């Protein structure tokens, strides 16, 4: 049995992707519609939302327009999510070489990361 300690972690692109997913879902916007507004395929946008690909500044600007909010607000929510995750002991690591540089790191994604995003969005509205 493996007794090596495991840490929970995530990447900033995964946080931004989850923020974009949550904001899109709040607006009941299908992923394909946001992808079209940004000018990428749904498959490419899915990789951005899942954190497998970093969003470019141009794509962030277009997504923000489609979501009717400034890009800075999206990044502010991502920054708040990063703070909340860090407070809870989640390590934020660089996406490049994440598994080589951080053996034993268990990356948060999906619902686990979504909890921090939801909290950050609620906090940004207060």
Model-derived segments and their meaning:
Residues 1-26:
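A short, Lys/Arg-rich alpha-helix, primarily the initiator
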Residues 56-73:
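DNA major-groove recognition helix of helix-turn-helix/homeodomain DNA-binding modules
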Residues 19, 30, 56-59:
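Residues that mark the N-terminal boundary/hinge immediately upstream of a DNA-recognition element
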Residues 50:
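Short, conserved catalytic or interaction motifs in soluble domains
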Residues 22-47:
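Short alpha-helical DNA-recognition segment
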Residues 77-117, 121:
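Short, charged recognition helix plus adjacent turn
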């Amino acid at each position: 049995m493996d007794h090596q300690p495991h840490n929970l972690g995530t990447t900033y692109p995964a946080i931004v992707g989850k923020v974009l997913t949550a904001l899109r879902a709040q607006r009941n916007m299908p992923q394909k519609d946001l992808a079209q507004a940004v000018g990428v395929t749904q498959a490419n946008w899915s990789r951005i939302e899942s954190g497998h690909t970093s969003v470019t500044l141009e794509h962030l600007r277009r997504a923000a327009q489609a979501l009717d909010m400034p890009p800075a607000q999206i990044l502010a929510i991502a920054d708040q999510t990063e703070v909340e995750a860090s407070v809870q002991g989640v390590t934020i690591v660089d996406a490049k070489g994440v598994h080589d540089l951080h053996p034993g790191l268990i990356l948060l994604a999906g619902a686990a990361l979504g909890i921090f995003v939801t909290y950050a969005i609620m906090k940004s509205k207060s």
